[in-house]
Structure formats: C-alpha cells, structure tokens
C-alpha cells in the first residue's frame, strides 16, 4: 500500500477499514507504521507543498492539496509555516509567465485579462499577490501605451 506513494495517517486508516480490518487492528497497524518511520504526516505535508510549488501553485492550492490528502492539521500548519515567501514568489512568477504566454493578448482585451486572473486564482494565489506580481512585472499596463478608462489602448472597441 505504501509502495506506490506516501500516504497520510487518515488515508492508511481509511484504506485498511475499507478492506474490512477491525478498528483496533487498524489503529495498531497505523501506530506500528509510524514507529517504523513509514508513516509521517509532517514529511508528507512538506513533500506535497514542494510538489505543488514546483508546478506553480499558491498557498491556497497548497492548503487544498493537504486537505485532499487528509494530512493532520498540525502537520499541515507546520509545513505551511516553513514556506519561504521567496519560494512562493518564484511559483507565482512562473504561473504569471505561463498565463501570459497562454493568453498573448491579455493586456489589450478585458476578457483575456480576466482569463489570466482566473488562471492564477485557480492556481491558489491571492488577488493581492496577483496585483503585486503583475504590477512588479510591468504587466498591468499594455506596453506602457496610453490607455482609456478600461486600461485598453485608445480606439479599441
């Protein structure tokens, strides 16, 4: 069961119960796996956070991933508290780059701008982080051109 990927305590407990083991046997087996070092929610939470950051996910996505894996609250809080703002910033920058490559006209067309923002929000970044990142990268204005009230180049319908 643990051969394919690391599992949380709750995942192991659920799988054993689904296979029909008695709760006392399940509890004893979970305790044995923890003592043997084969079951560690803190290590799992750290690894899951690193994995999510590598693919450009933000803090909210990390929290959601840890909940899906049913990692204990203490282990999740510890792993999240160890996150470096710089590492999270790198993940955000990568996600911004991906989003702007995917939607090349995002600076000029309101719908494309909304798509970029939705993409980044779906990856777990907060709106404040997005505004700051887009502003720092000079991507909140279309190439420094004059813009109308909607932020579009003059004359764009």
PLM segments and residue spans:
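An alpha-helical, amphipathic repeat domain used for nucleic-acid recognition
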Residues: 1-157
């Amino acid at each position: 069961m643990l051969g394919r990927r690391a599992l949380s305590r709750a995942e192991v407990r659920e799988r054993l119960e689904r296979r029909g083991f008695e709760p006392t046997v399940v509890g004893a087996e979970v305790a044995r796996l923890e003592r043997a070092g084969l079951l560690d929610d803190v290590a799992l939470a750290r690894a899951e956070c690193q994995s999510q950051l590598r693919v450009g996910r933000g803090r909210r996505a990390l929290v959601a991933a840890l909940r899906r894996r049913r990692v204990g609250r203490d282990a999740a809080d510890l792993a999240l508290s160890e996150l470096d703002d710089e590492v999270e910033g790198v993940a955000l920058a990568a996600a911004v780059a991906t989003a702007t490559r995917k939607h090349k006209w995002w600076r000029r067309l309101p719908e494309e701008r909304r798509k970029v923002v939705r993409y980044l929000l779906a990856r777990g970044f907060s709106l404040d982080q997005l505004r700051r990142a887009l502003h720092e990268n000079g991507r909140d204005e279309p190439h420094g051109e004059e813009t109308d009230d909607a932020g579009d180049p003059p004359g764009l319908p």
